[in-house]
């Protein structure tokens, strides 16, 4: 895959598109001249051109005829614009172009209806894709040939670890869990950073402790294939009790419990709010996680 000239045309210039651009170009060394962006906002297109050395334009007739892969990378609030945008480029799309959607909640059936006769697939990645530490999955359309799947695998594995799924229903479940855990993990880290600062630690030290602890827990559980209680990491009751007392004092236990006990419909509603919030935050400061206002 790396040895092939592989043009990728993105429809959409928001956060979803930039996650891919940043990771593939800056972290994985993919050539910028293989990336093209079609967006509605001229200033945003100019920003992406300068930032990633790609070509970007508001002219939806440009670049499409060069595409090996067309990536639907439209942010959630703009999903309703997709049919009109596709209509502008339909007669320019190469007949063998792969249609690849990273737009949340846009079903395979909708993609196949917009691009009849084309191989189609959906990809899902979490926000850690920006550092190449994501976990993601994909599903393919009914008529999509198997020889196109390496493209999806390549894109996901460039940004993290691939999870195999059987169908779109399982794809949706995996995606929901990934984003729900993303939200709860960031909230938990935020809680611990704020508590550490209240206890008198510097913000830099607080952040280092919180992030390294979460990283270490993940690695330990993955390598041991155990849950925390089987690993017997709570054997020191005095230390454990002190930790729980600290959590109770600052209301952290209640906050984290509420997150993890959310029913599915609440998780989905929160995901939509999180995506919209991420988009708004992204407009202020690209890829800078602000834990404190």
Segments the model singles out, each with a brief description of its role:
Residues 1-5, 208-293:
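NAD(P)-dependent Rossmann-like dehydrogenase/reductase catalytic/cofactor-binding core
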Residues 1-65, 195-199, 283-293:
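NAD(P)+-binding Rossmann beta1-loop-alpha1 motif at the extreme N-terminus of oxidoreductases
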Residues 3, 20-21, 36, 51-52, ...:
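Rossmann-like NAD(P)(H) cofactor-binding subdomain of soluble oxidoreductases
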Residues 15, 43-44, 77-80, 106, ...:
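Short alpha-helical
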Residues 41, 104-106, 125-129, 170, ...:
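Glycine-rich beta-alpha junction loops
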Residues 110, 114-119, 135-173, 180-222:
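Internal alpha-helical scaffold of NAD(P)-dependent oxidoreductase catalytic cores
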Residues 172-176, 230-231:
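Short pre-catalytic strand/loop immediately N-terminal to key active-site residues, enriched for Gly-Thr
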